[in-house]
């Protein structure tokens, strides 16, 4: 706790220091009032904890505080992201692997674990301690908001991000994993937005009225939820949330509100979270000179099939990444150059450019480093990019491609070959699956079974709390600045009772939380990428669903002391499991 409280005052206002000054707006005053209200409710919750209130009273007070927080989440997450991750982040240690240290979790989700399903008086001291930390975090938010100027462009951008947050986290149970109060909380978030938007302009318009009407109708639809599991998320997103995002874009254009000048994973021009023109691959590059161009990708495509990168000239990138199998190889694990089994399953390269870590063990941060790692690996290619530069530069079939890709360069350099290969991989994001078309093209509809599968995925199955919509990987929305790993207890063999011995991220960082931890991969094109898991233990999607339904490794009887996947059974019916598989098959890109 001390380490957490020490770092909080270090958060600065640098992000806003160079911005144009605007007259202070109404949203700021309202926001400060709501922060004060939240603080009062947390203090009331604290008093209940001190007075040995009943379990029901504690939970009701907690839920009241959560609903108030959700009203200001749009601003807290946007303007104070560092405190926000401790206010409402997962109840897991916050790892800082480069420094080999971690921060204990805090905030609402830690408190939720203490009081749900029932509160034990043995946890009274822990509860009071966590409430004190939460109050300190709220104070940090108040001080920060008091010091900044909130201008219309930031408000609109923050509201956009909140809409994406509701879709990807808010309605999936990500931050309400035990109480399952996600739908009322999403409703609270929505109901807070009209007041914020109305304060941006003194001149209402039909566009503004339409936007506010859609938001209120979306909030009203939340009342249709009988419970967390039965809520129709597919309908909610398509008919309510996506149109709000589109209206927000129209509202911004009508009032000539500028875009915020920043490099974001979601393009400023995106009118929803779904489609082929939403994500910015340049948000995941090492620096601006690595920016994507189609010319680089074309050069990279030729290099991808070039066997000269391997020492013996027998293997190219395509040898293990077959386009017909979504750039995998269909093997449990591939073979090394000497014919022995490699340690891990070959992952898909589709959508690999939209994550902040590469390889199962996340040992490289970007695709440029990934390509170099593979080429130099003695078991995989055993090549040397430097030695190959002259051969490629002098090859007539490459010369025009090189000139188009890097027109300002006098000679080809190593980083450019890496960048070209990476650019080709960054071009493999089609976003044209049946799932994508369902949310972008009125004429395309998921079947009843597929929609049930999506609702299970984003609801009862809790799949979307790790495989985030719409990338379905572990890159955390809506900022997409962090890619997560999980410990799920994958067995050494199917139906086995021993965990696979692969150390995962622990091999690079000797932190107990990372033992057997692996990156959360994308599920896009999963129907083409069998077998599954880092070791290829499962042969079908059906087997994977059964494994998760049982609670992962710990749920099946494997000893996994640090499993991050809840070990409780999901209790999915046969119909739900079948529907879940049917849904995952809709994530296959069209050719």
Regions found by a protein language model. Give the residues of each.
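Active-site pocket scaffolds in enzymes
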Residues: 212, 542-570, 577
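C-terminal substrate/ligand-recognition segments
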Residues: 516-529, 534, 570-577, 581-590
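Sec-exported extracytoplasmic/periplasmic mature domains
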Residues: 43, 47-50, 63-77, 116, ...
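Extracytoplasmic redox metalloprotein regions
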Residues: 88-149, 153-154, 306-310, 315-316, ...
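Short glycine/threonine-rich turn/loop motifs
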Residues: 266-373, 438-539, 543-546, 552-559
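Mature extracytoplasmic or organellar-lumen-exposed domains after removal of signal/transit peptides
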Residues: 22-278
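Post-cleavage N-terminal segment of exported redox proteins
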Residues: 13, 18-23, 217-296, 382, ...
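Sec-dependent signal peptide recognition
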Residues: 2-10
């Amino acid at each position: 706790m001390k380490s957490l409280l020490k770092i909080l005052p270090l958060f600065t206002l640098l992000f806003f220091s160079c911005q144009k000054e605007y007259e202070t707006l109404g949203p700021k005053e309202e926001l400060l009032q709501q922060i004060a209200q939240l603080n009062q409710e947390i203090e009331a919750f604290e008093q209940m904890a001190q007075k040995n209130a009943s379990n029901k009273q504690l939970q009701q007070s907690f839920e009241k505080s959560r609903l108030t927080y959700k009203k200001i989440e749009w601003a807290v997450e946007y303007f104070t992201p560092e405190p926000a991750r401790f206010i409402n982040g997962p109840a897991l240690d916050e790892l800082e692997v480069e420094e080999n240290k971690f921060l204990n979790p805090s905030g609402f989700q830690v408190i939720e674990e203490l009081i749900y399903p029932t509160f034990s008086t043995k946890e009274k001291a822990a509860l009071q301690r966590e409430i004190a930390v939460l109050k300190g975090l709220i104070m940090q938010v108040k001080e920060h908001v008091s010091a900044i100027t909130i201008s219309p462009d930031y408000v609109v951008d923050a509201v956009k991000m909140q809409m994406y947050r509701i879709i990807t986290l808010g309605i999936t149970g990500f931050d309400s994993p035990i109480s399952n109060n996600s739908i009322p909380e999403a409703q609270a978030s929505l109901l807070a937005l009209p007041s914020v938007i109305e304060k941006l302009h003194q001149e209402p318009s039909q566009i503004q009225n339409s936007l506010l009407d859609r938001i209120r109708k979306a909030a009203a639809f939340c009342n249709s939820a009988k419970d967390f599991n039965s809520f129709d998320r597919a309908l909610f997103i398509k008919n309510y949330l996506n149109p709000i995002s589109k209206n927000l874009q129209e509202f911004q254009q009508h009032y000539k509100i500028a875009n915020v000048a920043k490099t974001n994973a979601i393009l400023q021009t995106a009118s929803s979270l779904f489609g082929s023109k939403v994500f910015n691959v340049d948000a995941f590059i090492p620096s601006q000179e690595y920016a994507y161009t189609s010319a680089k990708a074309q050069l990279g495509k030729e290099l991808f099939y070039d066997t000269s990168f391997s020492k013996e000239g027998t293997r190219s990138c395509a040898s293990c990444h077959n386009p017909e199998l979504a750039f995998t190889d269909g093997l449990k694990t591939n073979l090394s150059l000497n014919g022995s089994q490699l340690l891990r399953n070959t992952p898909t390269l589709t959508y690999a450019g939209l994550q902040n870590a590469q390889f199962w063990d996340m040992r490289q941060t970007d695709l440029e480093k990934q390509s170099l790692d593979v080429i130099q690996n003695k078991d995989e290619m055993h090549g040397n990019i430097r030695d190959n530069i002259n051969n490629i530069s002098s090859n007539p079939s490459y010369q025009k491609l090189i000139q188009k890709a890097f027109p300002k360069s006098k000679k080809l350099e190593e980083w450019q070959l890496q960048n070209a290969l990476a650019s080709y991989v960054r071009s493999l994001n089609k976003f044209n699956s049946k799932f994508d078309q369902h949310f972008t093209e009125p004429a395309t509809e998921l079947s009843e079974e597929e929609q049930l599968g999506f609702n299970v995925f984003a609801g009862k199955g809790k799949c979307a709390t790790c495989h985030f919509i719409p990338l379905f990987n572990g890159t955390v929305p809506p900022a997409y600045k962090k890619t997560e790993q999980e410990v799920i207890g994958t067995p050494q063999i199917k139906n086995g009772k021993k965990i696979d011995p692969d150390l995962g991220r622990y091999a690079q960082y000797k932190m107990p939380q990372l033992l057997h931890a692996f990156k959360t991969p994308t599920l896009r094109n999963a129907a083409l990428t069998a077998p599954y898991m880092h070791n290829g233990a499962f042969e079908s999607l059906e087997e994977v669903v059964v494994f998760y339904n049982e609670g992962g490794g710990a749920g099946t009887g494997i000893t996994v002391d640090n499993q991050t996947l809840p070990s409780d059974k999901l209790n999915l019916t046969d119909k739900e499991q079948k529907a879940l598989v049917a849904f995952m098959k809709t994530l296959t890109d069209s050719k």
